[in-house]
From Swiss-Prot:
The HXXXXD motif is essential for acyltransferase activity and may constitute the binding site for the phosphate moiety of the glycerol-3-phosphate. Its EC number is 2.3.1.15. Belongs to the GPAT/DAPAT family. It catalyses: sn-glycerol 3-phosphate + an acyl-CoA = a 1-acyl-sn-glycero-3-phosphate + CoA. The gene is plsB. This is Glycerol-3-phosphate acyltransferase. It comes from Shewanella oneidensis (strain ATCC 700550 / JCM 31522 / CIP 106686 / LMG 19005 / NCIMB 14063 / MR-1).
Length: 809
């Protein structure tokens, strides 16, 4: 390797300074890969390349890592800092052998044998000039810009044309101490490490670039030759009494409507545009859990991203983040309503494939779509779809639509060899552009059809939107899920591939709910969501600034000390910092008088802020319920509190997609924290500390509207234990409207008919519609709900139910 200060290297670095823009994956190797700055470190690269090492040198200088030009000196032994598996490839002839790598590695192992306390970190580094996967028929371009083993001339062309899209990826370090202790220090282990490293770099390239892209027409021809689609075309021709040629033409039209037309050139242009857009809109995008997804890709999993759906921004945000995290943007299932000019063609070339809202019993369309989805899985393309089916208008997760999940499971049943893994993704924003529109729709205004004019209107409103949040939840590998749900699924499918298993529909429903639960498990508690939660629980949606900051400090402590799950993320900073962030985003108003500052939510914005509160209300609903038990009882035992929580939890779980694994332990941990923080005093019983009652009252306020809904339902059931589900839904909704009008409840979800349907389904599952005469469970829960309400609200509910009963009687 030439010396760092040689004229040749100086010239190369000067040229690359202007031609090359490098993106580092992960962005902070020290934090994300647990590198130890106190231990010696060497880099492993696949191929020796002066331009690659020059690019690496620029990055290591910025990150505070050792320069690749500095030799590694340990125990008197001098070794190169960069160890390459293969030598440089000349313009003609073969590249050098890997003997230098083996010799260098043997020297480092020998030093470990002599010095037991030594532990060198061996960090694999991959460099990519552009990320085009290539096409199946792209022979000319591959010849010019061949990326895996380019000659120096090809490398010059790559730097010239693709230098602005250079990626440097660091991988988890290998401990040479571990290798020496576990496997010895002979030449055999050196050869083994070389083989493992080659496999690693090959897999890493596949993760970064993805599989080759098919020619669209060749893909259509391949799909039309599949047995299932040929059969569907024949059935279409027979049922519609048309020729098979006509039915085939219809199938081609469906394919053309559905299929993506991925373009790497468009993705590169979009990356620049989106970088500008995110920098204009957001002060930062917070990401959690990307490393585990990279590892799944590296291990050969077929990845299906299942994010929640807040905004049309979701389509762009997740793809952008994955691209910058060193993964290929997925093929995205988009609603056919987005297939309008010019967005439709652009989305399609960005990887979107379009799906109709309803298949309406169209067997040919169903067969075409299923076959296309199977092909995406078979070829190794990652896929993304929104299981909610549409954007949430209230900020809560919607009940899942199971169609795409069912098709994914069916693809596994039809014999995909690789593990297929669903990755739940929580997407959150400090500002959702469509919130005002959502509330108009909830109040009865007809949804506007998507068009180019809406796009221009949205662009006109671009401003400071705060921060975005992308949290990857706990993955679900479908083969493991099927083994757990139906242990004999492989043999059942093998015996009768055409027969739909009896367990399939229940399994799909369980899986869909598990996905939604794991999305909520990965929620992001931000300054806006937390501050909204506090202020909306206060009287008049206003608090003294110092009290608001103190309450936020309590919530931050609760989330950090008693974490909801390990996948949840919590805002950095203290209560004071969070309030300031919200004020800078103009989400809250501030006024001052001689006694201090007051932070409030403007009446016009109160409904909008419920959207952000609802993003995280599930994180606080149990602590809030516990606080309500304590506030409404002078003294109460732990057992009594757990009894109340245990009675309400099945409904909360169904409504809010909660997944607390050990409820008794969680309740105890929350109570212990309350005691430690001086909020609660414990003798034989528990009671609220008088001087901290205001904080507990605020916390209890977050569950009030939920308890009011449950009080309506259980008061109705207590009066009419044999009432039908449909009657309970309609009458609960009617009474909720009355209660809201009398007590000023404005939260949109309070009047959401779908929510009462969700609750009635769960009540049926729990046996409340069995018609049995024993009403003890209903009476107990009714009594619990009533006792946790303000007297005026309780009186309204009881009186309204009695009046309704008299009217129906």
């Amino acid at each position: 390797m030439p010396k760092q200060d040689s004229l040749w290297l100086k010239s190369l670095r000067w040229i690359q300074k202007y031609l090359v823009h490098t993106i580092v994956v992960p962005q902070d190797p020290f934090a994300d890969l647990n590198l130890d700055a106190s231990r010696p470190l060497a880099y492993v690269m696949k191929t020796e390349s002066l331009s690659d090492i020059a690019a690496l040198s620029e990055i290591t200088a910025k990150l505070g890592l050792p320069s690749p030009y500095e030799p590694l000196v340990v125990n008197g032994v001098v070794a190169p800092r960069v160890v390459c598996l293969e030598g440089r490839k000349p313009l003609f002839g073969d590249r050098a052998s890997n003997e230098p790598f083996l010799e260098c590695f043997m020297r480092l192992l020998a030093v470990h044998k002599e010095k037991p306390e030594l532990d060198i970190q061996l960090v694999p580094v991959s460099l990519y000039w552009g990320r085009t996967p290539g096409k199946e028929d792209d022979t000319m371009k591959a010849a010019v810009l061949e990326r895996e083993n380019p000659t120096w001339l090809r490398k010059c062309l790559m730097i010239l044309f693709l230098g602005r899209h250079n990626f440097v990826q660091f991988s988890n370090a290998v401990s040479l101490r571990y290798m020496a202790d576990e496997h010895g220090t002979d030449m055999g282990i050196a050869h083994k490490l070389a083989r493992v490293a080659r496999v690693h770099f090959r897999r890493q390239r596949k993760v970064m670039t993805g599989p080759v892209l098919p020619n669209r027409q060749a893909l259509f021809d391949s799909l039309l030759k599949s047995e299932s689609l040929r059969k569907a075309i024949q059935e279409e021709a027979a049922s519609k009494k048309i020729s098979e040629t006509q039915a085939r033409e219809t199938a081609i039209e469906y394919l053309d409507e559905i299929a993506a037309n991925y373009s790497d050139s468009l993705v590169r242009i979009a990356e620049r545009f989106l970088t500008w857009l995110w920098n204009k809109l957001y002060s930062g995008i917070n990401i959690k859990g990307a490393e585990q997804i990279r590892q799944l890709h590296h291990d050969g999993h077929e990845i299906v991203y299942v994010p929640c759906h807040r905004s049309h921004m979701d389509y762009l945000l997740l793809s952008y983040i994955l691209y910058y995290q060193g993964m290929v943007p997925p093929h995205i299932a988009a609603g056919i309503n987005l297939n309008f000019w010019p967005a439709g063609p652009l989305f399609r070339r960005g990887g979107a494939f379009f799906i109709r809202r309803s298949f309406n019993g169209n067997k040919l369309y169903t067969a075409v779509f299923r076959e296309y989805l199977d092909q995406l899985f078979a070829k190794g393309y990652s896929v993304e779809y929104f299981s909610e089916g549409g954007r949430s208008r209230t900020g809560r997760l919607l009940a899942p639509k199971t169609g795409m999940i069912a098709m994914t499971i069916n693809s596994v049943l039809r014999g995909i060899e690789r593990p297929v893994t669903l990755v739940p993704v929580y997407l959150g924003y400090d500002h959702v552009m469509e919130v005002a529109t959502y509330h108009k729709e909830l109040s009865g205004k007809k949804k506007q059809k998507e068009s180019v004019w809406q796009v221009f209107g949205a662009i006109r409103k671009l401003g400071n939107f705060g921060q975005g949040y992308v949290n990857f939840g706990e993955p679900i590998t479908l083969q493991n899920f099927l083994n757990e749900t139906a242990p004999n699924w492989r043999s059942e499918v093998a015996d009768d591939p055409e027969q739909k298993p009896t367990w399939l529909t229940p399994a799909v429903n369980v899986l869909a709910n598990r996905v939604m639960t794991r999305i909520n498990d990965a929620a992001a508690a931000s300054s806006i969501t937390l501050t909204s939660l506090v202020l909306l629980a206060s009287e008049q949606n206003a608090l003294e600034r110092c009290l608001l900051e103190r309450q936020l400090d309590l919530y931050l402590t609760l989330l950090k000390r008693v974490p909801y799950t390990s996948f949840t993320s919590v805002a950095e900073g203290d209560g004071k910092h969070l309030v300031q962030q919200g004020l800078e985003l103009n989400k809250f108003s501030i006024s001052a008088d001689p006694l201090g500052e007051i932070v409030s939510i403007d009446d016009k914005q109160a409904i909008s802020m419920t959207y952000y509160r609802n993003n995280i209300i599930h994180l606080f609903i149990i602590p809030s319920l516990i606080a309500s038990c304590l506030i409404n009882n002078k003294q109460i035992s732990r057992a009594q509190i757990f009894g109340v929580v245990n009675d309400f939890y099945p409904l909360l779980k169904a409504e809010l997609f909660m997944g607390i694994k050990d409820l008794p332990s969680y309740v105890d941990q929350v109570l212990d924290l309350f005691i430690e923080q001086g909020l609660v005093e414990e003798t034989e019983l528990l009671s609220v500390a008088t001087e901290r009652a205001s904080q507990m009252l605020l916390l209890a306020g977050s569950v009030n509207e939920t308890l009011q809904r449950y009080a309506i339902i259980f008061n109705l059931l207590a009066h009419r234990p044999k009432m039908e589900r449909s009657d309970l839904e309609s009458e609960s909704h009617l009474l909720a409207q009355r209660l809201g009008a009398l007590h000023g409840i404005t939260a949109p979800e309070f009047y959401d008919k779908k929510l009462y349907n969700t609750l009635s389904v769960k009540l049926k599952e729990l046996g409340y519609f069995s018609g049995k005469e024993d009403k003890s469970d209903v009476e107990r829960i009714r009594e619990q709900a009533n006792n946790l309400l303000r007297a005026s609200v309780r009186q309204t509910i009881v009186a309204s139910v009695t009046a309704e009963q008299s009217f129906n009687g």
